[in-house]
Swiss-Prot record:
GO molecular function: arginine decarboxylase activity; metal ion binding
Gene that encodes it: speA
Modified residues (N6-(pyridoxal phosphate)lysine): K101
Keyword Repeat: no
Catalytic activity: L-arginine + H(+) = agmatine + CO2
A Pfam family that the UniProt record links to this protein: Arg_decarbox_C
Protein name: Biosynthetic arginine decarboxylase
Pathway noted in the entry: Amine and polyamine biosynthesis; agmatine biosynthesis; agmatine from L-arginine: step 1/1
Amino acid sequence: MSSQEASKMLRTYNIAWWGNNYYDVNELGHISVCPDPDVPEARVDLAQLVKTREAQGQRLPALFCFPQILQHRLRSINAAFKRARESYGYNGDYFLVYPIKVNQHRRVIESLIHSGEPLGLEAGSKAELMAVLAHAGMTRSVIVCNGYKDREYIRLALIGEKMGHKVYLVIEKMSEIAIVLDEAERLNVVPRLGVRARLASQGSGKWQSSGGEKSKFGLAATQVLQLVETLREAGRLDSLQLLHFHLGSQMANIRDIATGVRESARFYVELHKLGVNIQCFDVGGGLGVDYEGTRSQSDCSVNYGLNEYANNIIWAIGDACEENGLPHPTVITESGRAVTAHHTVLVSNIIGVERNEYTVPTAPVEDAPRALQSMWETWQEMHEPGTRRSLREWLHDSQMDLHDIHIGYSSGTFSLQERAWAEQLYLSMCHEVQKQLDPQNRAHRPIIDELQERMADKMYVNFSLFQSMPDAWGIDQLFPVLPLEGLDQVPERRAVLLDITCDSDGAIDHYIDGDGIATTMPMPEYDPENPPMLGFFMVGAYQEILGNMHNLFGDTEAVDVFVFPDGSVEVELSDEGDTVADMLQYVQLDPKTLLTQFRDQVKKTDLDAELQQQFLEEFEAGLYGYTYLEDE
C-alpha cells in the first residue's frame, strides 16, 4: 500500500485521531495494535491474531482486550497532570481515582493497580465498595465513596477507614450525615468526609444531565451551608476534607470544563472562609475521548487533549488559591472513560450479505401502464447527450413513478412482474445517477447521502447490539467500526450493519466518514462469500457492564492480549462467555428441567430410537453451547 493510499484510508476512518497511536493500518492493509506507543516495536496485526485464535478454537464474537493500553492511559493522564503542576508551580498532589462503575472487570481493576502508577478507586454502591476494599491492600491510596448510601454502605466505608485506608465518604444527600456520625461513633473512628456540590455550570450533549443544578446527586449551596453547621455543632468540622463536583460525562468542549472548575474553585475558597480545611479537590469525571476522530465539540468527540485538560484544571484551582492566599489542595479526577475506552475491541464475523444487485430490464411493452413507460423514458433521457435536466430531477421523477407503481400494486393495478421490473429499473437509475455525482459539489451532497443509504450493502453481523454496544442503541453513541483487513483498497462500497437479534433497533445508524458522520459505512471491495471480520473499537468503557440480555444473547468470550517488543504475543482467556444454559437460568428456566421436558416429548413421538437419541444429544449440546451463531 502506497503512503498516499494509506493516508487516504486513515482519513476515511479517522484512525489517526480516535486510534490515538494505539491503532493503525499496516503495510498489508490490516489493523495493527500498539498497546504502548512509547514502545512502537511492540505491535500486533489484529486480523492475523484473530485468524490464529480462530484456528485454535476461538469463537466469535469476542472481546480482544489490551491491558497494556489501560496502563499506558493511566501513565499518560498522570504525566499530563505532572507537566501541568510543574508548569504552574502547583504544590499539591494529583491522584487519578478510577470509578469502577465504568468497567468492574477484574482484568481492568488489577491491570491498573499493577501499573506501578499512583491510583485511587471509587465506588458508587455496596457491591462496588466491597470490590474496592478487597483490592485496597494492593494500592494504599485513596478510596472515594459516592452514590446513595444506606447504613451498611456507610459502615463498610468506615471499616475501611479503621483498617488504615484513606476512605472519603462523599455526602450527596443531607440524610446521610446523621447516619455517618452515628456509625462513626459506634465504630470509634474519625470519619473522613467529602461533600458533592451541585454546580450551576453544566456540560452539553448526551450526558449533560449528570451535571448541573438538575443533577441527580449533590448538595445545593444552602445544603452545603447546612452540612457545615451540622458538622460544626457535632465537633466534626475537621472531618470535612474533600470537595467534589461533577460536570458531566464525556465533556466535549474544554470551555465548559474550565467554566465548571472556576465555579467549583469558589466553593473551595468559601468553605475555607467558613473554617473548613478542604484538602482534596475532586473534579469528578468528564475527561472525554474522541470516538469520532473529528476533534470537535460534537457529542462523541472532544476539542482538547490531555495536556489542555490538565492545564485548565490546575491553573483554575491554582489561580483561585493564589488570589485568596490558600494552600494548593490535592487534585483528584475520576477519569474512567478516558482510561478504559481504548483498551477493548469487539471482533465479529459477517454471517450474511445482502447487496442491491440489479440488471437493466428490457423496454416495457407498448401497452404497458403509463408509470412504467414514464420510468423508461426517464432512463432513456439519462443516456441522451446534451440533456438539460438535473440529476436531482431525474431521481425525483423515477421516485414518483415508483411510488405510483407501489400504490397501484397494492390496489391490484400492477402485477408482481411489473413491480419487480420497476424496482430493477429504479436501482439502475440510482446507480447511473450515483456515477455522475461529484462529492466536492455541495449541491450533490444530499443526493449522495440518500443514494448511499439506498444502495448500501446490508451486512448481518454475529453480535447483539444490545449486549455489546448498548449505548449505540440507547443514546445513539458513535463507535469506530471498520473491517480488520482490506484497508489497502479504496472504500468504494457502502454498508449498514445489522445484528442478529429479532429487533429492528439492532442496527448501527452512524459511522465515521472522514470529517463527518454518515448513515452508511465506507467499505473496500470484498468477496460477499468471504467477507472480512469487523472490529468495533473503543468499547472498553461502560459497554460490557451496561449490556443487556435481549433475545438471551449473553456475554461474549473475552481474551487479554499482551504484546512485547520482540514481537511475541501472549493471549489469555479471561471470559469463556455465556452458554445458552447460563442465559436461561437468568430468567429462572432450569436447563435440566428443560432437557427433561424435551426428552419426554421426544419419547412420545414415532421416531426410531436412534433418531430420538440424536435429537436429545443435539438439544443438550445446544444448551451448553455459545449463545451466538457458530459455524459447523
